[in-house]
Amino acid sequence: FTTPQISSLGGGGGGGGGPPPPPPPPRDLISSLMTTIAVIDNGICNLRSVTKALEAVGALPRVVRTPAELTGSSAAGLVLPGVGALRDCVGALRTARLDDSVRGWIAEDRPFLGVCLGMQALFDHSEEGDVKGLGVFAGSVVRFQRPPELKIPHMGWNTLRFRQSGSPLAAGLAPEGEAVYFVHSFYCAPADPSLVLAECDYGGAFTAAIGQGRVFATQFHPEKSQAKGLQIYRNFAALAAA
């Protein structure tokens, strides 16, 4: 994506005759500026892409690797990204003792965003290597069973269909048809259908995002989804700043 330039909010003095001052930035941008968002580094995530996306929408990303660093960050929001194998993602969280930190954060309904493996890790179990997840939400992570003409992994652009109306994460996005970027062979099957924030079709419907309170997760990569993905990070930063 192209990182938008955010002009300085500072003003200068001066006499009359000059050009009129620029209009103030949108309130959501003002609210998200200087908001610290912790980003968990589990060793297998696209850390740079996520932090750059947060910077692009005016937030201050803070990379954390331990519970102490998370506490010390005084972050208003938490992002758990991940790419690769779920076993490695969950294993790294447990080794760093961040698994309890994530569960505790979510239990308090603090602003949270899981991305790709960061979404899959929240469920009870995955068919990928028979992995036990964090158990935040009841449900499983299952492998695509699709016609031979549909390649696995599901890779590339696909369109969303939002199932929860009025979700703060979807502000500024169309209810249906927004294109986002996926790379995955497994998808989440929540036990509670009301958890599904958005669906996508790939030989059949699957869960593309979940939402409950101020806790969200996406199977797709907002940081790779250009303007629409930045809107999701902008919405999350505004939610964290509220």
Model-derived features: positions:
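Extreme N-terminal starter segment of soluble prokaryotic enzymes
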Residues: 34-38
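Pocket-forming structural segment of enzyme catalytic cores
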Residues: 124-202
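Acyltransferase
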Residues: 218-242
